[in-house]
Structure formats: C-alpha cells, structure tokens
Amino acid sequence: MSVRIRLKRMGAKKRPYYRIVVMDSSSPRDGRAIEELGYYHPVERQNQVKINKNKFQEWVDKGAIPSDTVKRILNKSNFKVDN
C-alpha cells in the first residue's frame, strides 16, 4: 500500500476548494481519506492554505509521498517541502 499526500476536491461548481489529505495511491480523488491535514482555497485572496505542519511531517517520516501539486502549493505558501 503506497500512501500519498494529495488534494481532495470539495465545494460547489465553479467555487472549488481542496482538502489536503493522506490517501492510498489507488483511491479515487474524492475517495475516503486516511487523515486530513489541511485545506487549500484557490479562489480566496487571503488564507489560501492551512496545514498542520506536525502531522504533515509525521506522515512524510512514515513514508507518505506528497504529490507534485501539494509540493508546489506548500512551497508557494512558504512551507518548504523537500523534493
């Protein structure tokens, strides 16, 4: 079982927001998450990203791999993610 940290789409049509979640890599995008770590609101001007940094680091230490999109979003919000 390979575990990934990725985005889960929520919200209404044309007003998306995403939860940053830990999921099995074979799960569908909107499937059941193992744990929620934070959120990303692309439409908002302020408070676009919130993440529990301790839980994120805990999952990375366990071997979870962040998706490229999650890495890009977190690096953009001044939370450095190693490649």
From Swiss-Prot:
The keyword Ribonucleoprotein applies. Gene3D superfamilies: 3.30.1320.10. Keywords: Ribonucleoprotein, Ribosomal protein. GO terms for molecular function: structural constituent of ribosome. The keyword Ribosomal protein applies. One of its GO terms (biological process) is translation. InterPro entries: Ribosomal_bS16, Ribosomal_bS16_CS, Ribosomal_bS16_dom_sf. Pfam families: Ribosomal_S16. One of its GO terms (cellular component) is small ribosomal subunit. HAMAP family: Ribosomal_bS16. Belongs to the bacterial ribosomal protein bS16 family. This is Small ribosomal subunit protein bS16. The gene is rpsP.
